Amino acid sequence: MKIIYFSFTGNVRRFIKRTELENTLEITAENCMEPVHEPFIIVTGTIGFGEVPEPVQSFLEVNHQYIRGVAASGNRNWGLNFAKAGRTISEEYNVPLLMKFELHGKNKDVIEFKNKVGNFNENHGREKVQSY
């Protein structure tokens, strides 16, 4: 499964690099409108008061048919808006919210994400994956 991510401050990029997963693509202003022709999990940060970043919105407008799950980063100081972009994407595109993590994540978050991606790959197409 492809992992597509957007990193406004570098936290999500650091998180993804720590997973050592190979099939990844970073969304940028230059490529956010390019089509992707395979299923993916999207990982994004949250901006402002819980908003989905504009490049992610643009990317999903073009590629929403291939999204299979979402994970989100945030800062717990934002309370109920912590990693809210993940919940927003999950609800809008009816896909599971696999996890939320703070900033660039802890080691346990990296392990959890890799396990969930692995389980998702195993179960994809056979049963619904449990949402976070």
Curated annotation (Swiss-Prot):
Gene Ontology biological process terms, A to Z: protein modification process
Superkingdom of source: Bacteria
InterPro entries noted in UniProt: Flavoprotein-like_sf, RNR_Ib_NrdI_bac, RNR_NrdI
One Pfam family from the record: Flavodoxin_NdrI
GO molecular function, a single term: FMN binding
Protein family membership: Belongs to the NrdI family.
Classification via PANTHER family: PROTEIN NRDI (PTHR37297:SF1)
Record function comment: Probably involved in ribonucleotide reductase function.
The protein's name in its UniProt record: Protein NrdI
Organism, scientific name: Staphylococcus aureus (strain NCTC 8325 / PS 47)
